[in-house]
């Protein structure tokens, strides 16, 4: 029998010496570590972030993040606030125990130098550079006194467990779509973030000075770096109990101890009002409904057992058994109420962790910021407590990754969680060719809009005398002039715009019975209408003109309309056959074409035109002799008098329409500011024509703005619905009580919103853009050149 040789691998190893064991242990400690992070990257607790936005936290845990914008909540109608609250409850009830939700609210300072540069208007080397510099200074001053360059962003991170990345992706996508649906029902703009966006947010938290984020996915492989290397701070230090170091700055994480019997829906908003760098996080973990009910029932049973023990003790001691410790009675009632809510109402139970992260340049500033945040908590009978020796875990839990390492939790029902409403006021801050429209009075953020991007850029400016209506128009004119190449036209019934137009080297056309400036109301160009023949729209204008001339409450009769239309076709026949200036008709041609019909109705219209053809008001019976070549043109119609003013406004509107049709082919927008706009809406035919032009402006690249102080006259027009439906931009300044009531009903303004147009200061009010209603303030400093050329106050105008 052969002997089996034992392989060398299985031979009993030699016993290690004590010195060898010590050496090996040292090597293992060096390379294995003690579990504590040794680098800033190691503190960031995720394994990978993928380009589609999925974050792998560990082998079985994955998260995605939604960025959502603010909506107007605090100033909304009560029924709107209730609806938003109910939709929030629905969102939380959608989340089951397998989904962890983290709401993050970040107030982040951007690079002040770069931020200020974004509002600079570059010099052009012309006569307006001093105005550009002054206007830029005004914007930057408003920026400094407003939000101090703080950008406020909101995120919802949802975390799940899954066996692998493929399964996680499918479920996260489905959950993301469902959550977006809930945001949509609240009227909130939201989107699921991709990986680059998530990394940029992390970088912003770790670099609070606003250092720009530089990263591309194709940089990873050649560099051998991970995504953490691009977002991590230069250093993290957790050497003290209640603060930590963050790349040369100081930070502290606190938790909210909820002590109040009732919570306010303004509490979260007040935390976010602070102008310091702050990051507020709410970790919300749903408890399985069946398990929650069982737990509460067990608690009630325990409380009942304690009650029985207390009653037995009372009987033995010889006093009333109904006298129980107050805490025991209170806890028992609260537990039964909670059970009733879970069983009979649409309520669920959640565990909430509320964290506040403050970051500052110095320890003293950090202490002040934390004290300020603690004051907000105290206001609502809660307490903000610094985390002791858990600052690293607090920082990790404050990152929008969906990780909560702080187990200081408070059980709350659905409605209690939803009371932390994440909305205050919607912002209007568009990029690109946006212009400045003031400061959001609620959030102190700048309002930057591009009206040309709106569905209907047409606008209205309404306010009492002295409310800043003209200043608002002039401020917008300056913005358009300095930041675009668009044409600007002004209908100026009170000669208020002359100083501004003169300083901007614009053209003033003065129309009056004694003026030598003439504008032919019958001017037409071949692009006048979308139709093959431009006569249809021009005929509407002539009908409106004749209606104003003839007067009367009933307007033109059917036969009168017919004879006018027939005359219009006749007088334009030569011009359409040979479109040269010599063939352009004037009013006397229309007058003669009416007489040539030999009809009593035609004669009646011709007689009404006599005053404007051969009488003392024949200022409009001439060919146009002004070259409207300037990009800024003001029509001064102050001296036309009451009889001619409406005609003048109608003719100006028609002239500007002609310019709009010409500019359309060149891709240039045409802005039109019409003061005393209500005058065009009194007569039926004129109102109908103006409403039609109002609608056409939008399609042809026009941006009209009607301004008036006579709100009742404006709103009494039969065409006001068409005007309002085609106006996505409305500025409401101070209003008289009657007008305020009418506007509030027509525009569905809440009581809180109405306060901003009641005895408001000049330049303050409400701005309505599409579906957003914002309180705003847009004062122009009096010690500026701009103010002096824009003011309408007599004492200040004289100083010019």
Task: Show which residues each predicted segment covers.
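Post-Walker A helix-loop "phosphate-sensing" segment adjacent to the P-loop in P-loop NTPases
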Residues: 479-489
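Hydrophobic positions on the alpha1 helix immediately C-terminal to the Walker A/P-loop
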Residues: 472
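A short helix-turn-beta junction within AAA+ P-loop NTPase domains corresponding to the substrate/partner-engaging
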Residues: 505-509, 719-732
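P-loop NTPase motor domains
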Residues: 71, 78-97, 104, 108, ...
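Conserved P-loop NTPase
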Residues: 747-800
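Conserved lysine of the Walker
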Residues: 469
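Extended, folded cores of ATP/NTP-driven motor/assembly subunits in large transport
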Residues: 2-423
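Hydrophobic anchor at the beta1->P-loop junction of P-loop NTPases
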Residues: 461
């Amino acid at each position: 029998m052969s002997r089996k040789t034992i392989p060398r691998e299985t031979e009993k190893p030699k016993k290690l010496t004590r010195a060898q064991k010590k050496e090996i242990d040292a090597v293992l400690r060096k390379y294995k570590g003690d579990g504590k992070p040794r680098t800033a990257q190691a503190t960031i607790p995720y394994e990978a972030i993928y380009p589609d936005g999925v974050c792998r936290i560990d082998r079985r845990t994955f998260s995605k993040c939604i960025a959502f914008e603010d909506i107007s909540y605090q100033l909304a109608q009560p029924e709107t606030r209730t609806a938003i609250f109910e939709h929030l409850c629905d969102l939380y009830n959608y989340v089951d125990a397998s989904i962890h939700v983290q709401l993050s609210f970040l107030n982040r300072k951007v690079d002040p130098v770069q931020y200020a540069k974004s509002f600079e208007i570059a010099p052009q080397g012309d006569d307006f550079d001093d105005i550009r510099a002054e206007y830029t200074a005004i914007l930057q001053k408003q920026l400094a006194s407003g939000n101090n360059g703080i950008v406020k962003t909101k995120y919802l991170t949802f975390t799940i467990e899954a066996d692998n990345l493929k399964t996680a992706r499918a479920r996260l996508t489905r959950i993301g779509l469902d959550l977006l649906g809930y945001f949509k029902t609240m009227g909130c703009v939201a989107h699921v973030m991709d990986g680059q966006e998530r990394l940029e947010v992390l970088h912003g938290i770790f670099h609070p000075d606003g250092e720009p984020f530089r990263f591309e996915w194709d940089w990873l492989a050649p560099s051998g770096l991970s995504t953490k290397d691009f977002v991590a701070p230069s250093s993290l230090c957790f050497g003290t109990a209640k603060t930590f170091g963050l790349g040369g700055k100081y930070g502290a994480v606190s938790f909210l101890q909820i002590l109040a019997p009732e919570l306010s829906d303004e509490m979260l908003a007040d935390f976010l009002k602070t102008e310091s760098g702050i990051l507020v996080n709410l970790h919300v973990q749903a408890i399985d409904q069946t398990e929650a009910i069982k737990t509460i029932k067990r608690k009630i049973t325990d409380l009942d057992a304690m009650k029985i023990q207390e009653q037995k003790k009372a009987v033995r001691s010889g006093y009333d058994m109904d006298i129980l410790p107050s805490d025991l009675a209170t806890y028992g009632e609260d537990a039964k109420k909670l059970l009733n809510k879970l069983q009979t109402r649409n309520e669920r139970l959640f565990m909430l962790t509320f964290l506040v992260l403050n970051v500052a340049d110095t320890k003293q500033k950090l202490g002040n910021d934390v004290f300020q945040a603690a004051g907000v908590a105290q206001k609502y009978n809660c307490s903000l407590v610094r985390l002791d020796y858990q600052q690293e875990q607090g920082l990790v839990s404050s990152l929008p990754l969906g990780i909560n390492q702080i187990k200081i939790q408070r059980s709350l029902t659905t409605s209690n969680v939803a009371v932390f409403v994440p909305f205050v006021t919607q912002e209007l801050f568009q990029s690109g060719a946006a212009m400045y429209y003031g400061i959001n009075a609620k959030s102190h953020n700048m309002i930057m809009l591009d009206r040309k991007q709106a569905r209907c850029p047409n606008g209205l400016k309404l306010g009492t005398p002295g409310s800043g209506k003209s200043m608002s128009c002039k401020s917008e004119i300056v913005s358009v002039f300095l930041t675009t190449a668009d044409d600007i036209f002004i209908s100026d019934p009170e000669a208020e715009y002359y100083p501004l137009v003169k300083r901007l080297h614009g053209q003033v056309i003065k129309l009056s019975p004694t003026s030598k400036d003439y504008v032919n109301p019958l001017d037409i160009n071949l692009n006048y209408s979308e139709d093959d023949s431009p006569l249809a729209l021009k005929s509407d204008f002539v009908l409106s003109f004749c209606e104003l001339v003839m007067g009367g409450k009933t307007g033109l009769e059917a036969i009168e309309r017919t004879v006018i239309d027939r005359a219009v076709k006749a007088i334009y026949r030569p011009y359409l056959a040979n479109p040269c200036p010599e063939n352009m008709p004037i009013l006397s041609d229309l007058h003669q074409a009416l007489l040539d019909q030999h009809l009593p109705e035609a004669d009646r219209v011709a007689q009404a035109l006599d005053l404007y053809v051969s009488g003392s008001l024949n200022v409009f019976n001439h060919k146009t002799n002004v070259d409207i070549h300037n990009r800024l043109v003001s029509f001064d119609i102050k001296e036309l008098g009451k009889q001619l003013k409406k005609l003048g406004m109608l003719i100006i509107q028609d002239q500007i329409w002609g310019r709009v049709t010409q500019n359309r082919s060149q891709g240039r927008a045409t802005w039109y500011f019409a003061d005393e706009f209500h005058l065009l809406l009194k007569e039926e035919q004129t109102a109908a024509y103006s409403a039609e032009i109002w609608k056409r402006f939008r399609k042809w690249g026009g941006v009209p703005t009607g301004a008036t102080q006579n709100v009742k006259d404006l709103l009494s027009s039969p065409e006001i619905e068409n005007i309002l439906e085609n106006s996505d931009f409305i500025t409401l300044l101070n209003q008289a009580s009657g007008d305020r009531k009418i506007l509030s009903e027509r525009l569905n303004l809440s009581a809180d919103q109405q306060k901003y147009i009641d005895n408001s200061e000049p330049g303050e009010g409400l701005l309505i853009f599409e579906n957003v209603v914002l309180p705003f303030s847009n004062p122009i400093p009096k010690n500026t050149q701009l103010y002096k050329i824009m003011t309408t106050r007599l004492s200040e105008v004289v100083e010019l």
